[in-house]
């Protein structure tokens, strides 16, 4: 009995089937089963083909059991083709949203198609340097990385990014790296920060840290670069929750916090903070804030997100666009799970190009480079 082959197709089969359907129960388990295979299904298909050819060459797939295993492998291959189709559709969805706003996204085939096909690992390009683990506070979690072009003469806008993971875990070196690298190549100063986690820190602590990082970006611009009049805040999941709250908060000159020029929310969670109810004195959901002073906002979410349902992003988009005088982009990605920005995948590359197009008015006047180097 080909035990190794059976284990291979069992793992691929469970992950593929779970990724194909929209899971509404056991969402966190579904996320861990599908996060990787959903972004690089072509590599899973390659593994499946290689394993099948190897099993055939060794004579392991004979008799009734062998026939059944081949049929199962064939069905899994078809499922992986469907996941690939959904992943590659992201580019047309992003391009359509951009066109609705009178903008075109980049047609760089090397970065949009070839790189995700052959090497989906989000390594930092040679043109970008990272200055790491800089403190913005006394706590060990109050650290940030700065990403800049190695040509120190470039003077672009500033992006401040916050990671997700439910305010309870996470790292600033797992998510958003493709976006950080992409903008840094274009001359932006990109800051990716960690923050204290619950239960040791609470809602007001997180917001205070977000404001502290924004002030740090302004106060250290002469050292690390960046135009303090063009600061963009971004985040994923819990980081997007923090970003949306900051973007929709009314201006408060007493806090001396730089006003952000735009916001980027990737697979945002928008609920009330843990343990809070409707009687909270300070709103912890962006849906309770007036969007009339909101800057331009970009929202992207997957319709197969099993950790944070896509309905949350739709609600945030509807809330903002009905009250904000500025543009609001919403990209709903077919088949996408939570944390789709962890790899340099077709889907993530498309979203990043959409963000670059969305931020183009803010980046005008910045000396740009044509591609990753």
What are these regions (language model features)?
Residues 166-169, 174, 190, 216:
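Serine-hydrolase catalytic-loop signature spanning alpha/beta hydrolases and amidase-signature enzymes
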Residues 17, 25, 29-57, 61, ...:
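N-terminal cap/lid segment of alpha/beta-hydrolase-fold proteins
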Residues 306-315:
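Conserved alpha/beta-hydrolase "acid-adjacent" motif
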Residues 173-191:
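Short amphipathic alpha-helix adjacent to the substrate-entry channel of hydrolases
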Residues 2-28, 35-51, 314, 323-373:
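C-terminal catalytic histidine-bearing segment of alpha/beta-hydrolase fold enzymes
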Residues 155-166:
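Short beta-strand element of the alpha/beta-hydrolase
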Residues 212-282:
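Primarily recognizes the serine-hydrolase "nucleophile elbow" in alpha/beta-hydrolase
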Residues 293, 299-301, 305:
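Short beta-strand/loop motif that positions the catalytic acidic residue
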């Amino acid at each position: 009995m080909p035990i190794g082959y059976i284990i291979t197709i069992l793992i691929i089969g469970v992950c593929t089937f779970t990724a194909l359907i929209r899971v509404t129960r056991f969402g966190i388990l579904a996320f861990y089963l599908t996060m990787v295979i959903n972004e690089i299904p072509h590599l899973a298909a390659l593994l499946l083909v290689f394993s099948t050819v190897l099993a055939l060459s060794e004579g392991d797939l004979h008799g009734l059991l062998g026939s059944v295993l081949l049929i199962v492998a064939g069905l899994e291959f078809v499922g992986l083709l469907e996941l690939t189709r959904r992943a590659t559709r992201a580019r047309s969805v992003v391009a359509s949203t951009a066109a609705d706003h009178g903008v075109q996204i980049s047609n760089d085939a090397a970065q949009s198609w070839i790189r995700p096909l052959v090497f989906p690992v989000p390594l930092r390009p040679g043109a970008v340097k990272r200055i790491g683990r800089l403190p913005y506070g006394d706590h060990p979690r109050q650290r940030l990385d700065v990403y800049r072009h190695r040509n120190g003469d470039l003077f672009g806008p500033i992006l401040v990014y916050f990671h997700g993971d439910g305010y309870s875990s996470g790292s600033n070196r797992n998510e958003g790296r493709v976006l950080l690298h992409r903008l840094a190549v274009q001359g932006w100063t990109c800051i990716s920060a960690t923050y204290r986690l619950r239960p040791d820190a609470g809602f007001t602590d997180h917001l205070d840290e977000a404001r502290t990082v924004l002030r740090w970006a302004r106060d250290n611009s002469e050292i690390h670069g960046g135009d303090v009049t063009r600061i963009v805040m971004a985040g994923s999941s819990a980081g997007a929750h923090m970003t949306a709250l900051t973007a929709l908060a009314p201006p408060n000159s007493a806090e001396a916090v730089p006003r952000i020029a735009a916001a980027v929310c990737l697979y945002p969670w928008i609920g009330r903070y843990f343990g809070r109810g409707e009687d909270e004195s300070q709103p912890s959901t962006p849906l309770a804030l007036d969007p009339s002073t909101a800057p331009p906002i970009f929202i992207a979410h997957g319709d197969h997100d099993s950790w944070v349902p896509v309905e949350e992003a739709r609600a945030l988009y509807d809330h903002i666009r009905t009250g904000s005088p500025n543009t609001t982009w919403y990209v709903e990605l077919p088949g996408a799970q939570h944390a789709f920005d962890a790899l340099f995948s077709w889907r993530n590359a498309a979203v990043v190009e959409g963000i670059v197009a969305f931020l183009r008015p803010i980046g005008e006047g910045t000396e740009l480079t044509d591609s990753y180097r």
